[in-house]
Amino acid sequence: AIHRYRFPPQEVELKEGDKLRPSDGSHFAQIKHLDRTAGIVDVKVGKAAAEYRPTAVFHCEVVSNVPLQESIIRFAERLLGDGFRDARSAAWDLLASNRPRLRSGPFAARDGESLAERAIRVMLDLDHSILPIQGPPGSGKTYLGAQMIRAAVRAGLRVGVTAQSHQVIQNLIDAVREQAAEAGEAVSVGRVLSKDEPPLDGVTPFRSGEKGKALDALTDRSVHVLGGTAWVWASEEAEGSVDVLFIDEAGQFSLGHALAVAPACGSLVLLGDPQQLEQPRKATHPDGVGVSALTHILGGHETMPDDRGLFMPETRRLAPPVCEFTSELFYDGRLAPIPALAQQRIVDSGRFDGAGLYWVPVEHRGNRNAADEEVEAVERLVDTLLGAGWIDDRGRRRRIEPGDLRVVAPYNAHVNRLAARLDARGVQVGTVDRFQGQTCAAVIYSMATSDPADAPRGMDFLYSLNRLNVATSRGRCAAFIVASPALLEPECRTPRQMQLANGLCRFVEKAIEVRT
């Protein structure tokens, strides 16, 4: 039976398909439809619970991490046994944050060598070692990763792909397939799918219980590239199964998970950017456990040191004024736009012609995680932009459509209010987690909280530099921040809080102030 419930405004991170449990922890129902804006949820209830009417439910799905634990224990036992003194090991190089070790050639760039050529050369010459690659917003790290995977396949190597989620794995595999098709190359790809995921065109599917079959496909070369989560690669049967393993979004992939999967490969390539979103956390852990593999390698640096890995210094997304802010605040001034981006700009808006940063102060009080005053300001901004046009990096002039805008907010409660007002216009609204990897003509970041002391998750969340980076770097031409001016005057008690506040304050210093 399908039961419909209404719920009051609240932070909701559930999704369709999630299983719900009442306070006693027993299985109650599964979400079939969820409308966060209207506060309605439809749930499918089994016969045994057909007459049960709980007043509150929660979702908690525990995934066993035993294979990862066992892999790390095997690694630790070997480390305690011989200390890897004579062994060439990607796992040890990762843990020790060693420089990439090559068989023959130099790690430094050769004269006239492009970044892609260097990345491919170094990857093919790795001596059971690691190659970290940091790619800022719009730098093309997925495209580069696909180029490297194709080169590995051409060299006869067995290739694995892993990431924090099935979707990220699929995105990289899709890029490999698209490039291979354009080049006329035959690349066979497979994936160990999630539980309820349907088979995908052009991808050999394996279910979660078919890891052995998937690994056999690598051995007999019926599959050149295999994608799977850490649970696939951490299994003992996967040890030594691939010559090179790619970890995509390694800035969100914990060091512990990376060490667990490393025994599966000869060499390890880590693609990502620790300056964007951090690894998602679903529980309380000891301090330091959540550090990502790339963050560990960076060792406190904002950008990849030249002797530790590769830094992708060009963005193909951000117009010069937006890139200047992003580069200064997050990338040690090392990120630059390609020349074609100088022509990207908004036109025919009457107020926002050109490219750049815009600060929209909105006075309000007493709001913690949602602000109607900001919703109204965002609505006016959206209407102005939808009546304008923009010029892309190829000089093509076009009208700004709803799909050319993104509206970002830190809290789901504020997202719901914004969506209720903007859904009819077709403009996408969400948290930064939804939009990482996406791009648009202009982005609007609405911060919702009236005063720093009101922030529900404290300064670390509301002023997060990672989230500010992702939010403001979605827009090709322009980034708007809509917020209470009181957020510019937090009561900082630590150097870290001063650093967090500096991100927003620096944006405002470089931005044009506008009133709606």
Placement of each model-derived feature along the sequence:
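ASCE P-loop NTPase motor cores of helicases and related translocases
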Residues: G46-L226, R334-G395, G403
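Flexible, glycine/threonine-enriched loop-and-boundary segments that flank and lead into catalytic domains
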Residues: A1-K15, K19-F28, G209-K213, T229-A230, ...
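Conserved ASCE P-loop ATPase motor domains encompassing nucleic-acid-directed helicases/translocases
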Residues: A1-R85
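Conserved helicase motor core of SF1/SF2 NTP-dependent helicases
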Residues: R154-G156, A163-A175, W231-I247, G251-T516
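Short linear interaction motifs
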Residues: I2-E11, G112-R118, L462
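Active/binding-pocket-proximal capping segment
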Residues: L34-A38, K141, L193-D196, V242, ...
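Short flexible coil/turn linkers enriched for glycine and charged/polar residues
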Residues: T37, D127, Q436-T439
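Acidic, low-complexity intrinsically disordered tails
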Residues: A1, L95-L102, P106, V508-T516
